[in-house]
């Protein structure tokens, strides 16, 4: 660890950045204390150091900072936040300061928010089902313990509601008491942050939720620190307290915009879409902090939520996120306009690990077959709608008209559910069987006969 060094030769202040001359031994991400002539102190991080100039990113912004009379102290260590199980039920900013008028964290350990590298050979493959209570996720795109599964939303779509509902309802069945949620609100508007807080408090979910919040009007560095602090807490709860932790990060688009703002202030050569060329690597350092570790009982499951600019799934943020994570849940504006909540487009959504965490002994024996059949039948229903728009519904065959009915029931009964409706996996699969029953049995080609005889409404209850 480096010793504390003090400097006073500020060469330039630009946006949230301070350029300090005469620094030859600064470390990347080294914590800095800025003392102004009036005694006010602020904090920052070294984000670059070359040719004797250190660039310091100030947490509280540089407004009011003078190039003369200001002291810069390099503290010889990275940003550390005191972490404790006491943070569950509380709200903090990315620096670990209380935002709920409660006491500071007394008992705890100081941890570097950048985390520790995890040996890939020490990872354990995700295989345990997490029940979110959302049919379109549990039934068709199951979330597994240790997985990273993002939600791609659009401006104005109810991503906040879905995030809050999942945070309230998600659980590992049989281990409910050992489940916690770390909820990171990145660059949130004040009314959104208030919505999350009130919702968790009113529903009682706050007792198992720790909130890490940065607001939209805060400097960009606070937004970049938010997911890192949240995941540092998640790592502590998972790997030292043996808890199953779901980390919900909303909105990762705000994180990437903060990266772009900082990069522009540093006058870096922009990459695709004006974002820094290292954004892929930066996102990977966040998303790869999910997982299970051999020999550890706990786990970290991630659900990053991002807003696709102009609903463009090929935009750099969702595009790069998709490369790193293990699938995606896509919210659809057309479904939202039809009054469907949550407006999940199941045909564009995917959970790459789902097949390993569902079925007999994990959820229910018919889960895989029902999931495959629902996908196939809904895909045909969507194709049939397109055909009906061209030739007219009257020209369709009897079977095609049943697929149209199936498509409508699938959206209204299976995908759509109430904001406070928590469906267990058995209820989800039973609803799937109910809407599949409108199709002839001969069309259920993806389901084994034994499951049709056991679960189909025409046979259920019969000996």
Swiss-Prot record:
Keyword annotations from UniProtKB, A to Z: ATP synthesis, Cell membrane, Hydrogen ion transport, Ion transport, Membrane, Transport
InterPro entries for the chain: ATP-synt_VA_C, ATPase_a/bsu_AS, ATPase_A1-cplx_bsu, ATPase_F1/V1/A1_a/bsu_N, ATPase_F1/V1/A1_a/bsu_nucl-bd, P-loop_NTPase, V-ATPase_su_B/beta
Location (main, coarse): membrane
GO-annotated biological processes: proton motive force-driven plasma membrane ATP synthesis
Example GO molecular function: ATP binding
Record's keyword annotation contains Cell membrane: yes
Keyword Transport: yes
Protein topology in the membrane: Peripheral membrane protein
Subunit structure: Has multiple subunits with at least A(3), B(3), C, D, E, F, H, I and proteolipid K(x).
Family: Belongs to the ATPase alpha/beta chains family.
Function according to Swiss-Prot or TrEMBL: Component of the A-type ATP synthase that produces ATP from ADP in the presence of a proton gradient across the membrane. The B chain is a regulatory subunit.
Protein name according to UniProt: A-type ATP synthase subunit B
């Amino acid at each position: 660890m480096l010793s504390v060094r003090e400097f006073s030769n500020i060469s330039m202040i630009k946006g949230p950045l301070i350029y300090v001359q005469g620094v030859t031994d600064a470390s990347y991400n080294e914590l800095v204390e800025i003392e102004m002539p009036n005694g006010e102190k602020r904090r920052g991080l070294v984000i670059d150091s070359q040719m004797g100039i250190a660039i310091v990113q100030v947490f509280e912004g540089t407004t009011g900072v003078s190039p003369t009379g200001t002291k810069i102290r390099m503290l010889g260590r990275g940003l550390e936040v005191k972490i404790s199980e006491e943070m569950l039920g509380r709200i903090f900013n990315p620096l670990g300061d209380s935002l709920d008028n409660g006491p500071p964290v007394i008992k705890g350990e100081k941890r570097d928010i950048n985390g520790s590298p995890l040996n890939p050979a020490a990872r354990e493959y995700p295989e345990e089902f997490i029940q979110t209570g959302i049919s379109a996720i549990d039934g068709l795109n199951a979330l597994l313990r240790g997985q990273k599964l993002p939600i791609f939303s659009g401006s104005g779509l109810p991503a906040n509601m879905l995030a809050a509902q999942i945070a309230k309802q998600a659980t590992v069945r049989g281990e409910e008491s050992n489940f916690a949620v770390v909820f990171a609100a990145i660059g949130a508007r004040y009314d959104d942050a208030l919505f999350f807080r009130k919702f968790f408090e009113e529903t009682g979910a706050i007792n198992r939720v720790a909130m890490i919040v940065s607001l939209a009007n805060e400097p960009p560095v606070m937004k970049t620190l938010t997911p890192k602090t949240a995941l540092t807490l998640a790592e502590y709860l998972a790997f030292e307290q043996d808890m199953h932790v779901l980390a919900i990060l909303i909105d990762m688009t705000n994180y990437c915009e903060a990266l772009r703002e900082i990069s522009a202030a540093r006058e870096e050569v922009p990459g695709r879409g004006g974002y820094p060329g290292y954004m892929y690597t930066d996102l990977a350092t966040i998303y790869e902090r999910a997982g299970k570790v051999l020999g550890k009982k706990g786990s970290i499951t991630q659900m990053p939520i991002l807003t696709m600019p102009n609903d463009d799934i090929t935009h750099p943020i969702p595009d790069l996120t998709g490369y790193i994570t293990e699938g995606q849940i896509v919210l659809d504006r057309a479904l939202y306009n039809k009054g469907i909540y949550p407006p999940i487009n199941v045909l564009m959504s995917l959970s790459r690990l789902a097949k390993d965490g569902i079925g007999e002994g994990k959820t229910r024996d018919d889960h895989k077959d029902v999931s495959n059949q629902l996908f196939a039948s809904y895909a045909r229903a969507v194709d049939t709608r397109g055909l009906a728009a061209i030739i007219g519904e009257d020209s369709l065959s009897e079977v095609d008209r049943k697929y149209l009915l199936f498509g409508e029931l699938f959206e209204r009964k299976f995908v759509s559910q109430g904001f406070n409706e928590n469906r267990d996996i058995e209820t989800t699969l039973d609803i799937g069987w109910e809407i599949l029953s409108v199709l002839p049995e001969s069309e259920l080609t993806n389901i084994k006969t034994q499951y049709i005889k056991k679960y189909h409404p025409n046979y259920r209850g019969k000996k």
